[in-house]
UniProtKB/Swiss-Prot annotation:
Record-linked HAMAP family: LexA (MF_00015)
InterPro entries: ArsR-like_HTH, LexA, LexA-like, LexA/Signal_pep-like_sf, LexA_DNA-bd_dom, LexA_repressor, Peptidase_S24_LexA, Peptidase_S24_S26A/B/C
UniProt-recorded name of the protein: LexA repressor
Organism for this UniProt entry: Ligilactobacillus salivarius (strain UCC118)
EC number: 3.4.21.88
Amino acid sequence: MTKSEKRQHDILRYIFSHVSDSGYPPTVREICNAVGLSSTSTVHGHLSKLESKGLIKRDPTKPRAIEITLAGLEMLDELPNKTQIPIVGTVTAGEPILAVEENRDYFPLPPYFESADDLFMLSIRGESMINAGILDGDQVIVRKQSSANNGEIVIAMTEENEATCKRFFKEDGYYRLQPENDTMDPIILENVTILGKVVGLYRDLI
């Protein structure tokens, strides 16, 4: 990487950080101050190079109209799938129902996760997991995996291809999907498919 390319990378990184922190891109003067350049014309030159490489898009008639393209995000290793979790539908915490994988929306990656790789989010319907603090209407963050240890909370697919959120136990000759609700019975299965392990929870308090 040449000195000029390093400077352009620093500018691109600062634009991304400013948008992430403030919700809008910086001015050229703010870029100057951030990367240690005194001339706005020098920054304009670097921005033109970034634009010609397809890393940003600009509107020259507006002072803050700088948008980082997907190619620019890829260079920064900040593609959306690294920082957002797909919301793929609804799963039951009651009687099993089909989980609908719609990929209709995305949820920002919580700060305690390093990467969104292999994560997805499901909305919970039902009250079978209330003793574990998972309530009707909550959204759970799930890590895709095909196995689980006894006692872990999982999203499991039954023999009828219906998905449910339960605590997993492998018993002698069968599987037990245990609800966390004293009024409900466990689901006993000869075969079960683990879709993933529940690793987080989000609840809208508003």
